[in-house]
Amino acid sequence: MAAKLARLHSLRERLGATFSSHPNELIALFSRYVNQGKGMLQRHQLLAEFDALIEADKEKYAPFEDILRAAQEAIVLPPWVALAIRPRPGVWDYIRVNVSELAVEELSVSEYLAFKEQLVDGHTNSNFVLELDFEPFNASFPRPSMSKSIGNGVQFLNRHLSSKLFQDKESLYPLLNFLKAHNHKGTTMMLNDRIQSLRGLQSSLRKAEEYLMGIPQDTPYSEFNHRFQELGLEKGWGDCAKRVLDTIHLLLDLLEAPDPANLEKFLGTIPMMFNVVILSPHGYFAQSNVLGYPDTGGQVVYILDQVRALENEMLLRIKQQGLDITPKILIVTRLLPDAVGTTCGQRVEKVIGTEHTDILRVPFRSENGILRKWISRFDVWPFLETYTEDVANEIMREMQAKPDLIIGNYSDGNLVATLLAHKLGVTQCTIAHALEKTKYPNSDIYLDKFDSQYHFSCQFTADLIAMNHTDFIITSTFQEIAGSKDTVGQYESHIAFTLPGLYRVVHGIDVFDPKFNIVSPGADMSVYFPYTEADKRLTAFHPEIEELLYSEVENDEHKFVLKDKNKPIIFSMARLDRVKNMTGLVEMYGKNAHLRDLANLVIVCGDHGNQSKDREEQAEFKKMYGLIDQYKLKGHIRWISAQMNRVRNGELYRYICDTKGVFVQPAFYEAFGLTVIEAMTCGLPTIATCHGGPAEIIVDGVSGLHIDPYHSDKAADILVNFFEKCKQDSTYWDNISQGGLQRIYEKYTWKLYSERLMTLTGVYGFWKYVSNLERRETRRYIEMFYALKYRSLASAVPLAVDGESTSK
């Protein structure tokens, strides 16, 4: 706290000193802000005014420039201007300037939020306002302080807690008890009751070591199982003498001289994960014929690829551990009796390419009975509590045991995962995919404009509950947690915000919390592989792909005909919604005549054959047709309906490579960018948004290019320059293609992902057992917040019924 106050005082004093030495310059600047009247100014607006003013004399404003460039927003209530200043990711200060009196004062988070609320209320709310603050519960909890440590939580946790827990022999007893507690459905693993003390454990390990060093390394565990039982050792150490000896050496090293790296390796080696539940309630979750349906996109692909890799890793580790246990993975989603031609009405569906993974579907129900039709992800909240109870019963029925890990996906899945983990006492993992608060700017302060349509009061509350309850959080990128130097991260945006009339969040999450871990996914390499692998190419699809791209026929699957089929293709594939910005790409292309001359545009989005139930998609459809007419794009553009066959989509990416085209991802914000990974894995040069995950996936100019969709003219110029360089240098396209592939192999594969997830589950499961990582105090606070606030918000959401739509 002292450091924070010192920083605030330093900031206030710096600004005050700048006012004293440069009063005229700063009056001129802040007057520009005040003259815009009551409202909120975003970072780019603040800097635009600043840059316009300093153009004539930059030296005068230099002392203030660093402060202003760190400001993320300003609240203007004349004569006051309040600034939210972010010196670095995860660190925030708040100040207020009275332009009339040249006075500067620091603000607490609560004071800043109360000031901000006046934008809506028009006056300070003098009544007591509910404030949500998780900071006191984490005050004594270890956390890193450097931005570079964000997202590397498990490494920090291991360093801190291994030194704390293993400082003397007595402190090692939790590890002994943890190993003794290991069992699966009543079958003891690792240690039996013959070992009662650390001395006994070390003695048995030494005897086992001596025995193993005297037999062939490939001796199966079954040949010395009984001898080990007499020593107090059970199955789980390994499947052969060498692997058992390696595990024993790891533990002996830990008992002698604890080391965080060895601890993580040991915990990743021992058996801890056999039953996994993955929750993804909303949308149409199935293996085919669903991509492009409302609320159905990258998350479905992510989970299906995830479970295949995870099952393979679980089977491999179980075999290496010398166990005869069958793992089970359940993807739990909503059952839709009105399945509209999909398998979403089928209770259990085997996941293709797996042996022990099923999709388990459980219906939404209320006092009106089972809900038959799809509803928007924004309308699910009144159903989730009852749904959780039904899911718990179905899981126990299918698994005949509690899961070892529950993984939530998106806001609804994470809330159900929270309720289940709380009920069953199971390790919980959270994957956000996208936090809507960042996708819809100012949806917190101007909640009234959004809430009747999107029910964000429910969703933001559910997000806060889940992210604070969970044991660990997986993100695909650093940006998802803490943004970049200039942009705020998705989770970071939940540090402090206000929902006027409901509550203020003065400390909602700490991005330095060691529960955060970056674990990036990949693409299914049996589907997405480089276009150069000619013997694997699916040429049987080429006639269908040529029909999609070049047919002279217009129908419900493809609209508009390309005039020049010899041009390279600018290709994009996404859902048709505002944030994905497919209409923005079309407008950018339409405005730039040079770009139209250089390349054709092919977009895959929406469904021409079915009237969407989603209002946002309906609006984008109308806008798209308007842009195509406005810029006379017939002959230059091909608009293809959403494609459900991902195997053919893989070959479609490779076919675009054959045209020497590019993949463009133009989203205003993209949490990760699975299509970016897919395109790069196929060798297709990729040009993607700089907002969100693609900014990390792509190294600009090496493995692809960045564009800013908020500056569409510059984005179009980047595309023009790319194609011009390709014309001038025949190796340029290949260099970007190969750079993308190299980036994928280094960081973005499902094999790396599944190995990391297994290790994280072991490490967090261990620390949860041996320490206060369960955060009991926090969870009691969450229980109260859930009961008193979330439930009332959820009950206020109109209950969807069959025969009408409340979709958005």
Curated annotation (Swiss-Prot):
InterPro entries according to UniProt: Glyco_trans_1, Sucrose_synth_GT-B1, Sucrose_synthase_pln/cyn, SUS_EPBD, SUS_N
Tissue: Predominantly expressed in the leaf tissues. Expressed in seeds, and at lower levels in roots. Expressed in leaf mesophyll and phloem (at protein level).
Enzyme Commission code: 2.4.1.13
Catalysis: reaction(s): an NDP-alpha-D-glucose + D-fructose = a ribonucleoside 5'-diphosphate + sucrose + H(+)
Induction (free text): By anaerobic stress. Up-regulated by sucrose, fructose and glucose and by sugar starvation. By submergence.
Regulation: Activated by phosphorylation at Ser-10 by CPK23.
Top-tier EC class: transferase
Annotated effect of mutating residue 10 to V: Loss of phosphorylation
Gene Ontology MF annotations: sucrose synthase activity
Changes after translation: Phosphorylated at Ser-10 by CPK23 in developing seeds.
Keyword Coiled coil recorded: no
Residues the record lists as Phosphoserine modifications: 10
GO biological process, one term: seed maturation
Ranges for region GT-B glycosyltransferase: 272-749
Record keywords: Glycosyltransferase, Phosphoprotein, Stress response, Transferase
A Pfam family that the UniProt record links to this protein: SUS_EPBD
Coiled coil: none
Domain of life: Eukaryota
Family under the similarity heading: Belongs to the glycosyltransferase 1 family. Plant sucrose synthase subfamily.
Subunit and interaction comment: Homotetramer or heterotetramer with SUS1.
Biological role stated in the UniProt entry: Sucrose-cleaving enzyme that provides UDP-glucose and fructose for various metabolic pathways. Functions in developing seeds by supplying substrates for the biosynthesis of storage products.
Descriptive protein name: Sucrose synthase 2
Organism: Oryza sativa subsp. japonica (Rice)
